[in-house]
Amino acid sequence: MKIAIDAMGGDHGARIIVLGAVEAVKEYDVNVILTGDEKILKSELSQYEYSKDKIEIIHCSEQIKNEDKPVAAIRRKKDSSMVVALNLVKEKKADAIVSAGNTGALLAGGLLILGRIKGIDRPALAPVYPTSKGVSVLIDGGANADCKPRNFLEFGIMGNIYANKVLGIEEPQVCTVNIGIEEGKGNDITKEAYKVCQRGPFQFKGNVEARDIPLGYADVILCDGFTGNIILKLTEGLATTIFSELKKAFLKNNITKIGALLLKPSLKIFKARFDYSEYGGAPFLGVNGVLIKAHGSSDAKAIKNAIRQGISFVNNDVVGDIVSEIESLEADFIE
């Protein structure tokens, strides 16, 4: 198996991406193709010991930066590390792509280069969301600010397959985010989405309120990308605030410091539950290929886990299952 990695993407440059790739080839049965500036990549790789036949470099003369306009960058920067990596997947020279680069450009590239799965109107980001019961899949995490009711059905199908095949959740419970659990709650879109999802090929549980999401009420959480991104960002900010306030409380005096020392192992486990690097990245579901979007500020651990995620998607043929499920839908679900 080969994973293409956009080695020039991310906030920390090639150093972190290369280290994550090296750790991945040591731990997993995978080969990696690094796309980017050959001189920089060779310099970074020279610092580590690894099986030389496990990592390949493809030189790219261009780089898509965070300030670049997504669609224009994909169309104009043909020799950028991101575009080259996407084309490797399209041409079947790589089984998946991992990138921590410009999110808008990566999603645009996924659509323009890999293309949509037939029957999927809106591909979507599907990050995992930590809960008191484990993790849930939240879809859409930010790719589509506005959605139609039928998009919720597509999200449910894709999220259900992801939760089952990759996360190992038996018969995932699927819910739509709403301001109340009753069927008649919400706006016109969410009301109609509820009706459509009731007929979907998955275990539809109904609506879920935001307060119940962290409690693990649903295994797959359906919402438009605007709502999903707000949920994610609010949770990230809240987690950061909680840990910051705990730190202040534990450092207040010598007694609290002793308490902190005793609780350190448990606090470490608790903090890891909210650490995005533990989960890797968010898959862009609905395109013809495995595309994993890693966080822009990913460390080496996050990159390694994003590669692991890509491996799992390929091994479980998630894309193939989505294609089959969409093809088997009745025409009135899609039209």
UniProtKB/Swiss-Prot annotation:
Record flagged with keyword Glycoprotein = no
List the GO cellular component terms.
Answer: cytoplasm
Where does this one sit in the cell?
Cytoplasm
EC number(s) on record? 2.3.1.274
Q: Which reaction does it catalyse?
A: a fatty acyl-[ACP] + phosphate = an acyl phosphate + holo-[ACP]
Q: Which GO terms describe its molecular function?
A: phosphate:acyl-[acyl carrier protein] acyltransferase activity
Instruction: Read off the InterPro entries from this record.
Output: FA_synthesis, Phospholipid_synth_PlsX-like
The protein's predominant localisation is: cytoplasm
Which biological pathway? Lipid metabolism; phospholipid metabolism
Give one Pfam family, short name only. FA_synthesis
Superkingdom to which the source organism belongs: Bacteria
What is a biological process (GO) this protein takes part in?
fatty acid biosynthetic process
What's in the keyword line of the UniProt record?
Answer: Cytoplasm, Lipid biosynthesis, Lipid metabolism, Phospholipid biosynthesis, Phospholipid metabolism, Transferase
Function statement:
Catalyzes the reversible formation of acyl-phosphate (acyl-PO(4)) from acyl-[acyl-carrier-protein] (acyl-ACP). This enzyme utilizes acyl-ACP as fatty acyl donor, but not acyl-CoA.
According to the record's subunit comment, the protein's assembly and interactions are: Homodimer. Probably interacts with PlsY.
Q: Which family does it belong to?
A: Belongs to the PlsX family.
What HAMAP family does the annotation carry?
PlsX
Q: What is this protein called?
A: Phosphate acyltransferase
Gene that encodes the chain: plsX
